[in-house]
Structure formats: C-alpha cells, structure tokens
Amino acid sequence: MSQSVSERTRIKSDRYESGVIPYAKMGYWDASYAVKTTDVLALFRITPQPGVDPVEAAAAVAGESSTATWTVVWTDLLTACDRYRAKAYRVDPVPNAADQYFAFIAYECDLFEEGSLANLTASIIGNVFGFKAVAALRLEDMRIPHSYLKTFQGPATGIVVERERLNKYGTPLLGATVKPKLGLSGKNYGRVVYEGLKGGLDFLKDDENINSQPFMRWRERFLNCMEGINRASAATGEVKGSYLNVTAATMEEVYKRSEYAKEVGSIIIMIDLVMGYTAIQSMALWARENDMLLHLHRAGNSTYARQKNHGINFRVICKWMRMSGVDHIHAGTVVGKLEGDPLMIKGFYHTLRLTTLDVNLPYGLFFEMSWASLRRCMPVASGGIHCGQMHQLIHYLGDDVVLQFGGGTIGHPDGIQAGATANRVALESMVLARNEGADYFNQEVGPQILRNAAKTCGPLQSALDLWKDISFNYTSTDTADFAATSTANV
C-alpha cells in the first residue's frame, strides 16, 4: 500500500533531524538490490574495526565511495539521492580469515565521467581507504559495464596487430631489459641493444628508472638504441625494437621525447605506472594517433597490490590499464624472483588477454565481464627468469606473452649475443616439442628437451650449466582464497 504524502514527509523529517545515523540505515545497504547491467560493481575485502558490524562496514565503504559524508545533509533532497547512493548488497565471510569479509557494492554508472580513469578511481579508491570504520580495505575486483567500457579506447595496437607487425605467430615473443639499468654510456647501451637483438631477441627495453640522467641523456640513448636496432634488423631480416622509456617530469617533456622516438624510427615507446592515470591515458591516445606500440612498466604497483588485506589487487590494475589503452604491461612470471602465485597470475593474464571473463574464484575473478571489443593487452613476464625454466614459462603463460630475460641474457658467461641465442633456441625447441605433442611440462621431459637442444647449441649448454640450480622458492603473499596453492617454483 502506498504511503501518504504526510507519512513520507514524516519519514524524511525524522531522517534529516537525526544528525548522524548508521550508513546501513542511510540507504547504502540493500540486501534485496537487483544489480543492473549498467552498474559498476566493486568487490572489497574489508576488515572491520573491532565491534563494527560487517554490514555497517560495507555500507560505510559504499557511502564514502559515492555520495555520503559523516552526517545527514539536507542537500541530498536536491539530488536523485536514492539513485546515486552506492548499494552494498552482499557480504560474505572470507574463507579461512575470521576477521575479513567480501563486500559487493554496486554503483550507478552516471556517478562516473565517461572515459576518465582518474574520475572512476577518485570515487572507488579516493577517500575510503583511510576510513576509520575499517582496519584494512582492499579492492579485489571490478565489473565495468559494457556501456562504460565503450567510453574508453582500449589498447592502441593490441596483440593481433602487434604480431602482424612483427610477422611472428604461434610463439611467445622474446625480450630483455638492458643491465645494468643505470650507469651505462649511450654508446655501450646501444651495443647491448644490438647484441641482444642480433642474438635472436625481438625486443630490448629500458628499465623503469632510466630516463635522462647525467651519465646518459635521453636523446643519446634513443640514437644509440636505434642504431643497434637498425643494424640488428638488417643482419637478421626480422622486425626488431627497443622500448624507449619516455617517462619524464612533465607531460610536455614526455610528448617531446615521444615525438623524437617516432622521428628516429622507433616502433615502440615505454612509460611507467608511476606517471599516473591521466598521463597514461594521454600517452595511450598519442600512441594510437601515431601508430606506436605502448609498453607500460608497472613500477610502484607492489606498494599497494602485494599485501593481501589492504590496497588494490593487481587484477584491478590490469583492468584499468587495458581500459586506458596500453599495449603491454608486466603481469608476473610465476617462476621468477617477483611475487607470483600461479592461480593469481592466471587471473591477471586472463584479464588482459580474454575478450570475455567468466567467474573463476580460484583465479580471483568474481564477476562475468565482456570487454566490449576493446583490444587485448600483451602481458610481459620479467624478473628472475632464465632459459632453463622455458617449459614452465610456456605452460603457465602460453603464447601471447613477452618473455623478458634481462639477467638471463646479459649475464650469460659467453656474452650478450650468446645469451640471446640461448633463449631463442630454448624457446623454439620447447615450442616445437609442444606442437609435436610432447609432455613438455613433465619435470623430466621438459629439461631433457632443453638438454637435447643444447647438444647443438653451445650458448644454451653454457646457460643451463650456469643457472640449472637457480630458483626463487618463496611462498606468495597474495594467494587464492578459494584454492590451496603455493608458489610454483619447481
């Protein structure tokens, strides 16, 4: 039965005379809420302060990340406040964690500016992470609706077009980071690029913190890198590249360096995650307009992505970066020196490479989501990997990935070119064995494939001898909540 005008007036009067009332009673909790296809959905892992009800904590997160403040305000009456309030609609206990809960929250899509990652994140992670009602808070996953995704450009090039440009199919791409990452002169830097590409790699790259320092200014680096690229391409007949890091103090300088990279013939440029979301989107637009690949180094991500109870899960960063429009992003190796539970890494790679995401709790994927024709993003595996792990890398990561062996190329005892050749032969022999039906991931079969290939490749034999006992066996900090897993270093 509908309420009379006087009854509705009394209810509103009671609400707005009450000063401070619980968030759950302010409209930010609705267990019967019917999720709309146009809603932005967020899953938070919440750790309420002692004595705070989980439902109230979830409602507080919904309120503080949408329209609420600490008290009732009359100006709510001047808005469609019932529509614009985020709705916490489900709270589940986290398995094997007595004080943690998964809170599902729905946001009206009109709360966010079209095509603006900065505006989306200003609400979702902007202020709420410092809220006293929760002891810790982590953004675990998001579902971005089709209608909102369509306002973002997605990767400027994508996996398919990148392979067409390189004319390379059915195999991972090979790369390496120049080492040492700081201190080389431009001439020696270019020599490293040439040796690595001549030996069989597809890409060399700058590291995250090489920009324009006194020992080597950016223009000097770009020129020497391009000399190495052009010589290696002419010698091998293959398309080659080196990720030229254009990260700088101002966007004016970033654009200046990017334009110069284009003028001297580079096919790819690189930026760092620490540039910020607006800068990343701006560079993705520039890369699309100028027909360049855009590589993103995830510098800084572990400051908020690694801890299990507070921060942002990296799968969310993967979604945001694919929306922003980068072509490459570092996404973990499983077997290297950096954080990488195998199931979590699978979830990151699915997020970057699939056109539709299904719910997969062991992989940390909580929502179905169509990518609305946004191009796929190429994951990059980098950090403590070597050719002796090739069977594991292909098994865990598949073909659509750039395998970057920095120390695993430049640390080769016979030199950089030999290190690159060892990686190329290891990769091609493993891909061939896989395509012929070999049980290559078997811990006896895979290494034997490499040993057989090394009989006719001295650089591979030297690499296997040097690194055969190297692994990084540490338990991952961020593991799946719905499956018992451990770091897969074997």
Curated annotation (Swiss-Prot):
Cofactor detail note: Binds 1 Mg(2+) ion per subunit.
Residues bound to Mg(2+): 205, 207-208
Site (Transition state stabilizer): 337
Keyword Metal-binding included in the entry's annotation: yes
Gene Ontology terms describing biological process: reductive pentose-phosphate cycle
Modified residues (N6-carboxylysine): 205
Broadest EC class assigned to this enzyme: lyase
Entry protein name: Ribulose bisphosphate carboxylase large chain
Organism this protein belongs to: Cylindrotheca sp. (strain N1)
Gene of this entry: rbcL
